[in-house]
Amino acid sequence: MKRRDLIRLVENNGCILVRHGARHDWYQNPQTGVCQPIPRHREIKEALAKHIIKMLKD
């Protein structure tokens, strides 16, 4: 999955960018308080993308 597509999905679920790390961007779901890093790679493996989406859902 492309990184920009994953970020679009995460932001459409109501998550916000918390901070820019050295190699990852951290997104948080404000309703649950869960934070999850998203790596800065053009391509993100499908299994990792599914895990990130699962963790940041409501």
Regions found by a protein language model. Name each.
Residues M1-H20, Q28-D58:
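Basic nucleic-acid-binding interfaces
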